[in-house]
Curated annotation (Swiss-Prot):
Substrates-to-products reaction catalysed: L-glutamyl-tRNA(Gln) + L-glutamine + ATP + H2O = L-glutaminyl-tRNA(Gln) + L-glutamate + ADP + phosphate + H(+); L-aspartyl-tRNA(Asn) + L-glutamine + ATP + H2O = L-asparaginyl-tRNA(Asn) + L-glutamate + ADP + phosphate + 2 H(+)
Family classification: Belongs to the GatB/GatE family. GatB subfamily.
Function text: Allows the formation of correctly charged Asn-tRNA(Asn) or Gln-tRNA(Gln) through the transamidation of misacylated Asp-tRNA(Asn) or Glu-tRNA(Gln) in organisms which lack either or both of asparaginyl-tRNA or glutaminyl-tRNA synthetases. The reaction takes place in the presence of glutamine and ATP through an activated phospho-Asp-tRNA(Asn) or phospho-Glu-tRNA(Gln).
UniProt entry keywords in alphabetical sequence: ATP-binding, Ligase, Nucleotide-binding, Protein biosynthesis
Gene Ontology terms, MF aspect: asparaginyl-tRNA synthase (glutamine-hydrolyzing) activity; ATP binding; glutaminyl-tRNA synthase (glutamine-hydrolyzing) activity
Biological source species: Listeria welshimeri serovar 6b (strain ATCC 35897 / DSM 20650 / CCUG 15529 / CIP 8149 / NCTC 11857 / SLCC 5334 / V8)
SUPFAM superfamilies (UniProt xref): GatB/YqeY motif, Glutamine synthetase/guanido kinase
EC number: 6.3.5.-
Keyword Transmembrane set for record: no
Protein name, entry field: Aspartyl/glutamyl-tRNA(Asn/Gln) amidotransferase subunit B
GO biological process: glutaminyl-tRNAGln biosynthesis via transamidation; translation
Pfam families: GatB_N, GatB_Yqey
Length: 476
């Protein structure tokens, strides 16, 4: 029997506000434990929440960016549960009236495009964080408690681990472009739970779903889904039944393990938050927020293809992160050729960032010095090979490309007389290569070009070397 996988993703994104959603405490990552707190975050008796308007507007902006309908009337609710990192014993969330509904985003997998529906986007507060020690007790940090979150719930439209990965990449990119979050999974500002079920191919009814947690990277989401597909199929094929449960992905083993039997919404005893009034959003407010949404990745891709003549693949890679795309735009503003800038950013720059585990803003590279280097290549001042040395110097130490070339003595040798002298010496010492060339062995030319480049420490003008080398050999 063959099965079809059905996946829905729940993505939590921390909003990049200065203060928390219901208190005046700072909402910044990395502070000393339990220092970013107020009596509201600690759940002290008698204190009242105050809604952060910026968090609401960030939620609206994110919802609009993923094509959601914005509610005219929304409200907050209490989600009741007890856990050490939740001092109030309830979480303020949104239950039946979320701020955004009925959205979608488009993904591409294997050259095929597909729309993934968004059920809802709602606002809520984050919980604190427990750190479990090896000494039999846990440490509780309330800093994260009350940080504003949006939860984005997809429709069960995803059919594979690859589609889930593509969905998360696209969602991250869109949210990053809006500026409402930095969406850094390593800092917990983007987190994902996956609801996974399988069903026989052709069956309309959904199977029993498993909720998968502890997915702290996109790769782990993919691995967790792939394992669950296999596990659930083995259970059904052996005559067993799938239990509705919450499971944890174990990164060390690549497997999942039982955490608890899955709760339903009734277990949380939702009821309207009595300390917050309902929120009404008029058209003028919506339009003001809509006007703040920048050009999103899909539209930017189309512009790169149509206006700049870039291949679709280049446009997709360049727009995957806002940082890279903005850097590319600024490099063009510094009058660099679009295709050359694209090639450098997708090639040497990306390779350097991956190897050094850095972001662009953590290097000495700027749009101006990258554009300057590209202009030096186009002018014939440096070769592409020398440009790699210049690039590394700029990335490590910054500065001006032209000045680096002068200081390091990297100017390309394009003087015909100087090159003929060097070529003459090379040919005098490699008469066998001349004979091989005249006998039709083209490899001899490559060898001699290499000798010239070696003698000039890579600074000879390659096209000129090829031209002059052939001329000099044909004279002999």
């Amino acid at each position: 029997m063959n099965f079809e996988t059905v996946i829905g993703l729940e993505v939590h994104v921390e909003l990049k506000t200065n203060s928390k959603i219901f208190s005046s405490a700072p909402a910044h990552f990395g502070a000393e434990p339990n220092t970013n707190t107020t009596v509201v975050d600690l759940g002290m008796p008698g204190v009242l929440p105050v809604l952060n308007k910026r968090a609401v507007e960030y939620g609206m902006k994110a919802a609009m960016a993923i094509n959601c309908e914005i509610a005219e009337h929304t409200k907050f609710d209490r989600k009741n549960y007890f856990y050490p990192d939740n001092p109030k014993a309830y979480q303020i969330s949104q239950f039946d009236k979320p701020i955004g509904e009925h959205g979608w985003i488009e993904i591409e997998v294997g050259g095929k495009k597909k729309k993934i529906g968004i059920t809802r986007l709602h606002l809520e507060e984050d919980a604190g964080k427990n750190t479990h020690t090896s000494h039999g007790y846990s440490l509780v940090d309330i800093n994260r408690q009350g940080t504003p979150l949006i939860e984005i719930v997809s429709e069960p439209d995803i059919r594979s681990a690859e589609e889930a990965y593509a969905y998360l990449e696209k969602l991250k990119s869109i949210i990053q472009y809006t500026g409402v979050s930095d969406v850094k999974m390593e800092e917990g500002s983007m987190r994902c739970d996956a609801n996974i079920s399988i069903r026989p191919i052709g069956q309309e009814a959904f199977g029993v779903k498993t909720e998968l947690k502890n997915l702290n990277s996109f790769n782990n989401v993919r691995k967790g889904i792939e394992y669950e597909e296999k596990r659930q199929a083995e259970v059904l094929l052996s005559g067993g039944i799938i239990e509705q449960e919450t499971r944890r992905f174990e990164e060390a083993t690549g497997k999942t393990s039982l955490m608890r039997i899955k709760e339903g919404s009734d277990d949380y005893r939702y009821f309207p938050e009595p300390d917050l009034v309902d929120l009404f959003i008029d058209d003028a407010w919506k339009e003001r927020i809509r006007a703040e949404i920048p050009e999103l990745p899909d539209k930017r891709q189309i512009r790169y293809i149509n206006d700049l003549g870039l291949p679709a693949y280049d446009a997709m890679v360049l727009t995957l992160t806002k940082e890279m795309s903005d850097f590319f735009e600024a490099t063009l503003a510094a009058r660099a050729d679009a295709k050359q800038a694209s090639n450098w950013l997708m090639g040497e720059v990306s390779a350097y960032l991956n190897a050094e585990q850095k972001e662009l803003n953590e290097t000495g590279l700027t749009p101006e010095n990258l554009a300057g280097m590209i202009k030096l290549i186009e002018a014939g001042t440096i070769s592409s090979k020398i440009a790699k040395k210049v690039f590394r110097e700029l990335a490590q130490n910054g500065g001006d490309a032209e000045q680096v070339v002068k200081d390091k003595g990297l100017v390309q040798i394009s003087d015909e007389g100087a090159l003929r002298t060097i070529i003459g010496e090379i040919l005098d010492n490699n008469e066998q290569s001349i004979t091989d060339y005249k006998n039709g062995k083209d490899r001899a030319v490559g060898f001699l070009v290499g000798q010239v480049m070696k003698a000039t420490k890579g600074q000879a003008n390659p096209p000129m070397v090829n031209k002059l080398l052939l001329e000099e050999m044909n004279k002999r």
